[in-house]
């Protein structure tokens, strides 16, 4: 099993979304689907992940103490679901660009504790209910699913895509429960709305996209491509208090840099801000170390109530192109100002991307920190909760804090694995200090 994304509802119940290859995955009575649907053999040798019988999506909910499985269901069709499937023989294809990109997607909850999933599928019979599009359009489509809080029924479920490959990387909601979906597409006929910011495919092997979908799933209100003539992909999406739309992604092209923003020339990570109708670019910047290469794989993104923009990502030789985080922008208030080139990078920009408020590395001096996919989160106070593959190659150099979770079977300040161990850090950027790390 793979855990791709977590979120807590208003009662602090923990909701999980991921992929499973198990026919005995625990489900609860009356759930939407208690049967494993399976798919094609799938093996990712670069991280050892093997699904002999293919994959389904699973969605599960635990109580706030983690002591009770409140609800759990399968979600899938006859082919692989819940993975951004690499269909080429090479390690990286057009949508699975970074190490770990096969396990992208996101889970969110609304004010009623209904559950939303952004993901990808290759199944022509994925369960669609009240669908915008009930047909698999290409080799792989993005999917958007809304389930009720008990996971007993689908409120709506739809394919989103064109005649090539598409993936769903992230979603967010506004106060009216309209859904904003983002990801990557190789389809030049991906649906966009007339008058949108970029209504036509811009070229290259992949574009990003943003779709705004009506609260009841009945229509696409606004939709646009995001991209250049080269590779581009959007990994995260957020809204500010004005419902302007922000995305965080990667590019190998020349993304626009608007007046008055903080930027680093010849960099390959981008942040863009569009109006709610997705027809106007309000601000755009590129950030990185100016070496012309992609430096980080995005892992978390947020916009706080004041309009400050937070991001997290990791870089190093595991990434395509032997990337490095050396010479990323670092501020005087950094938690860690030096790097071995294979660490996490954390950044905060001021409103409208106008200034660099915070830039720091986080990680060990020898090991190559990374993630094997999935998402982590900031809260609206600007605190990050990040899970990490730490201490890789049996190192003990991941930064840990005094009094962290007890040094026992369940937590340690040393790496008890022959390779990587799970590390977790929590950082409040307003305090400029690590609050907890285990």
Which residues does each predicted region cover?
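A sequence-level/structural motif corresponding to short, flexible coil/turn segments enriched
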Residues: 1-438
